[in-house]
Design a protein with these regions (language model features):
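Formylglycine-dependent sulfatase
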Residues: 1-171
Length: 171
């Protein structure tokens, strides 16, 4: 779509790999903002049985999940080589921080806002656009914010409450 003049963005979860060469902005997207793993993998560093730094130095740096990334395709080739993630290449990569259990409460709201901003910028530039939006919600390990609880009605689980909120995100 880029050769046809489209602005292209992917927002939300992306499970195609966490190395730089697998990021959406290395494969035709102008912009990406999202997470790279299943939610249970994202919250592992918060688990009580996660290997402690004192006993396993650098375990998290070597094996832990990458943070929520915001990336942009560039014309310039960045030769920076990260020992774990590989060569940066023709993209700019910003790690916005880990997807913690607390952040999971509002991650989809962050992703919706970023997608809306992308659409607004494309519209303001009078440019056609393509957005690929993938929510994290409705997966196992959902952590809803307090204001979401109870909105599905009496006798419903928080999973149902999150489904109502998810519907608000996607229409």
């Amino acid at each position: 779509l880029k050769p046809l003049g489209y602005a292209t963005g992917q927002f939300g979860k992306n499970h195609f790999g966490d190395k730089n060469k697998y990021l959406p902005t290395a494969h035709g997207f102008d912009e990406f903002f999202g997470n790279l793993y299943h939610l249970n993998a994202e919250e592992e560093p918060e688990n009580v049985d996660y290997p402690p730094e004192a006993d396993f130095p650098n375990f998290k740096n070597i094996f832990g999940p990458r943070g929520v990334l915001h990336t942009w395709a560039t014309e310039e080739d960045d030769p920076t080589e990260h020992p774990r993630w590989g060569r940066v290449g023709k993209q700019r990569i910003e790690d916005t921080g880990p997807l913690t259990k607390k952040r999971m409460e509002t991650a989809d709201t962050e992703f919706v806002a970023a997608a809306q901003d992308f659409i607004k910028r494309a519209h303001d530039d009078d440019k056609p656009f393509f957005v690929w939006f993938n929510t994290t919600w409705m997966h196992f390990r959902v952590h809803p914010p307090e204001h979401v609880l109870g909105q599905a009605g009496r006798w419903q689980s928080f999973y149902h409450d999150v489904m109502v909120e998810h519907d608000k995100h996607v229409g």
